[in-house]
Regions:
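Residues lining hydrophobic/aromatic ligand-binding pockets adjacent to catalytic sites
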Residues: 1-203
Length: 203
């Protein structure tokens, strides 16, 4: 079993592991929420370089919360800003228009209250876009340790390798690794699966 954190437009390496390990993958829902991590932050490539897209969450008076209980805040009109950032970054990529309508629903449609639900629904849609079966299994309880591969720190180092692929701004910045799945999807479209397969390090 592999345990991953819930992630907003998760890094490409997460999807490589989901493709390779399928139903062995679980998403952690019981851990204490860790702010400013993949749980509420995606990294995309822009004309100026890397850009963080961070979902604001409601605070709980400094008390620790389980990931499954974290609510999204509507502060700052973030949905509109994130969609505008994605559009600006990828509107000239080969496959943006192909996937834009399905992706826009998450930013222009009915708001989702909980961060975990939003991340999982977005993950399921991205998997459908990629044409891959996606594990949507959640952990049943919190386990500090056990017979599983613990990737809750958000790193897939040692299990995935960096595989360069076409990026719109590569002529300015070179290849930027470790980005959100949105970067791979909008740049490579159906060929994204080939990149994900190449990323897996055989054990």
């Amino acid at each position: 079993m592999i345990i991953l954190p819930s992630a907003y437009l998760a890094p490409v390496g997460f999807y490589a592991l989901m493709l390779a390990h399928g139903r062995e993958v679980r998403t952690e829902q019981w851990e204490h929420y860790v702010k400013q991590t993949v749980r509420n932050r995606a990294v995309i490539a822009t004309e100026a370089g890397r850009m963080n897209l961070t979902i604001p969450v409601e605070h709980n008076g400094g008390k620790k919360m389980a990931m499954r209980d974290v609510k999204i805040s509507d502060h700052g009109n973030w949905r509109h800003l994130h969609w505008q950032a994605l559009r600006s970054a990828y509107e000239h990529s080969p496959f943006f228009e192909f996937y834009a309508d399905e992706m826009a629903v998450f930013y222009e449609g009915r708001p989702t209250a909980y961060l975990l639900d939003f991340n999982m629904q977005l993950q399921e849609t991205v998997c459908q876009m990629l044409g891959m079966d996606c594990p949507t299994l959640l952990t049943e309880s919190y386990q500090a340790e056990g017979d599983f591969t613990d990737l809750r720190n958000g790193s897939t180092d040692g299990l995935t390798r960096e595989v360069p692929y076409y990026q719109v701004f590569a002529d300015r910045h070179g290849f930027m690794g470790g980005l959100s799945i949105a970067d791979l999807l909008f740049n490579m479209g159906p060929e994204s699966l080939l990149v994900l397969k190449d990323m897996i390090i055989d054990s």
